[in-house]
């Protein structure tokens, strides 16, 4: 079948040998990984060359791989129930993520060939800059602004890289995994100043893992002296 995903994979591997990190087919979905320096050129070829014809960009997002691959919570071992109940530790190993923390992922659509393709590129954690592809697909405008707003990824060449979901005075990037759930500041209307003001957040940050795992005594046999009512 000429327009099968396997055919797309064959064409990509033949055309971009040396320019892509991998081309992986899983669950019927094709993903390619492109080094940052080849990202724009590969995307341009995917759009313009007849063998590919990806005329539409349908999505772009940022990804934070902080703590990716950790197999368990950093907490005490569960007792009767919990995350680690009935798990044999030899079944898996804890895998530490050693690559860059942030990535940009785009999803492309070729209507003429009925293909979908996922393209991923990692950005330097210290610089956080990726080439903008707005010259190739105008639809990426707000997507790149969203990735900048939520993850702090800068897109070189974007003509209007401003926050799009948070307000102008927002501090930080809320989709980063180390961003506090309670935020950094809270705002309220000050009747004396007759305007909205920002103040340091006054609530305690939530903890996502149990602080204490207590022993479960519900199914333990009671001692004989504990039975017999209340006297």
UniProtKB/Swiss-Prot annotation:
It is found in: Cell inner membrane. Gene3D superfamilies: NADH:ubiquinone oxidoreductase, 30kDa subunit. Its EC number is 7.1.1.-. Signal peptide: none annotated. InterPro entries: NADH_DH_suC, NADH_quin_OxRdtase_su_C/D-like, NADH_UbQ_OxRdtase_30kDa_su, NADH_UbQ_OxRdtase_CS. It is a peripheral membrane protein. GO terms for molecular function: NADH dehydrogenase (ubiquinone) activity; NADH:ubiquinone reductase (non-electrogenic) activity; quinone binding. Keywords: Cell inner membrane, Cell membrane, Membrane, NAD, Quinone, Translocase, Transport, Ubiquinone. Pfam families: Complex1_30kDa. GO terms for cellular component: plasma membrane. It catalyses: a quinone + NADH + 5 H(+)(in) = a quinol + NAD(+) + 4 H(+)(out). It is an enzyme of class 7 (translocase). NCBIfam families: NuoC_fam, PRK06074.1-1. Belongs to the complex I 30 kDa subunit family. NDH-1 is composed of 14 different subunits. Subunits NuoB, C, D, E, F, and G constitute the peripheral sector of the complex. NDH-1 shuttles electrons from NADH, via FMN and iron-sulfur (Fe-S) centers, to quinones in the respiratory chain. The immediate electron acceptor for the enzyme in this species is believed to be ubiquinone. Couples the redox reaction to proton translocation (for every two electrons transferred, four hydrogen ions are translocated across the cytoplasmic membrane), and thus conserves the redox energy in a proton gradient. This is NADH-quinone oxidoreductase subunit C. It comes from Nitrosococcus oceani (strain ATCC 19707 / BCRC 17464 / JCM 30415 / NCIMB 11848 / C-107). The lineage of its organism: Bacteria, Pseudomonadati, Pseudomonadota, Gammaproteobacteria, Chromatiales.
């Amino acid at each position: 079948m000429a327009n099968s995903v396997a055919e797309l994979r064959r064409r990509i591997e033949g055309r971009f040998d040396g320019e892509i990190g991998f081309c992986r087919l899983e669950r019927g979905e094709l993903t390619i990984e492109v080094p940052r320096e080849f990202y724009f050129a590969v995307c341009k070829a995917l759009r313009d060359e007849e063998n590919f014809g990806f005329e539409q960009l349908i999505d772009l997002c940022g990804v934070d791989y902080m703590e990716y691959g950790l197999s368990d919570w950093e907490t005490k071992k569960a007792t009767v129930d919990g995350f680690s109940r009935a798990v044999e530790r030899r079944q898996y190993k804890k895998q530490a993520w050693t690559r860059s923390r942030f990535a940009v992922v785009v999803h492309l659509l070729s209507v003429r060939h009925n293909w979908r393709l996922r393209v991923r590129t990692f950005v330097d954690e210290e610089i956080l800059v990726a080439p903008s592809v707005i010259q190739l697909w105008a639809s990426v405008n707000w997507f790149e602004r969203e990735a900048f707003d939520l993850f702090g990824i800068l897109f070189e060449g974007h003509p209007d890289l401003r926050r799009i979901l948070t307000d102008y005075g927002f501090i930080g990037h809320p989709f980063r995994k180390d961003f506090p759930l309670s935020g950094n500041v809270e705002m309220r209307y000050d009747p004396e100043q007759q305007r909205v003001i920002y103040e340091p957040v006054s609530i305690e940050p939530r903890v996502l893992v149990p602080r204490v795992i207590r022993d479960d005594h519900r199914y333990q046999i009671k001692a004989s002296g504990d039975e017999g009512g209340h006297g």
